Amino acid sequence: MGSETTAAGDALDALDWNKGDGLLPVIVQDADNLRVLMLGYMNAEALAVTRARGEVTFFSRSKQRLWTKGESSGNVLRVVAIETDCDADTLLVQARPHGPTCHLGRTSCFPTAPSQFLGSLDALIAEREHERPHGSYTTKLFEQGIRRIAQKVGEEGVETALAGVVQGDAELLGESADLLYHLIVLLRARGLGLGDAVALLESRHK
């Protein structure tokens, strides 16, 4: 796990463990595309183990013991950051999943909502970059290199701007979709993700 900031560490040390009889709800979010992956519970020991090992570890209410996510399946959650809410009684863990999070073999324990599609697309593009399946347009882009990808973003940007001025809504939406897709590919080609851009937008909003 990456080093915690002093402020984050102080906030975690001041958690209110009394409200939930020693247990706090924990929301786990994909650090790269910000999709919610699962909900679990931690006691103080589980949090300490999570921070020390860098792998999300919960307290199982049914088994009454600590359990590290993926301890049997290997589908662990590597911790990137841990934050607390304003009441200090709920945790948000940003992590990078190694394999499906849900025991049903799904990426998330929650069904995908329309608003989460961009996050899912970002994850799919990252997968394409890693696996390079034959016949995939995304694979072709990555193999052509970052200059070609950047060129495509420029082309789609111009086409989107023109559609906004001289074409109808359907054309504007189509060009906007193409632009978003190629922009995510460009971010991935640079080793970045959609979540990085969103985090920057959030920091500017504060």
UniProtKB/Swiss-Prot annotation:
Residues 1-117 are annotated as: Phosphoribosyl-AMP cyclohydrolase. Disulfide bonds: none annotated. Its EC number is 3.5.4.19, 3.6.1.31. Pathway: Amino-acid biosynthesis; L-histidine biosynthesis; L-histidine from 5-phospho-alpha-D-ribose 1-diphosphate: step 2/9; Amino-acid biosynthesis; L-histidine biosynthesis; L-histidine from 5-phospho-alpha-D-ribose 1-diphosphate: step 3/9. One of its GO terms (molecular function) is phosphoribosyl-AMP cyclohydrolase activity. Residues 118-206 are annotated as: Phosphoribosyl-ATP pyrophosphohydrolase. Pfam families: PRA-CH, PRA-PH. It catalyses: 1-(5-phospho-beta-D-ribosyl)-ATP + H2O = 1-(5-phospho-beta-D-ribosyl)-5'-AMP + diphosphate + H(+); 1-(5-phospho-beta-D-ribosyl)-5'-AMP + H2O = 1-(5-phospho-beta-D-ribosyl)-5-[(5-phospho-beta-D-ribosylamino)methylideneamino]imidazole-4-carboxamide. InterPro entries: His_synth_HisIE, HisE, PRib-ATP_PPHydrolase-like, PRib_AMP_CycHydrolase_dom, PRib_AMP_CycHydrolase_sf. One of its GO terms (cellular component) is cytoplasm. Keywords: Amino-acid biosynthesis, ATP-binding, Cytoplasm, Histidine biosynthesis, Hydrolase, Multifunctional enzyme, Nucleotide-binding. GO terms for biological process: L-histidine biosynthetic process. It is found in: Cytoplasm. In the N-terminal section; belongs to the PRA-CH family. In the C-terminal section; belongs to the PRA-PH family. PANTHER family: HISTIDINE BIOSYNTHESIS BIFUNCTIONAL PROTEIN, HISTIDINE BIOSYNTHESIS BIFUNCTIONAL PROTEIN HISIE. HAMAP family: HisE, HisIE. This is Histidine biosynthesis bifunctional protein HisIE. It comes from Xanthomonas campestris pv. campestris (strain ATCC 33913 / DSM 3586 / NCPPB 528 / LMG 568 / P 25).
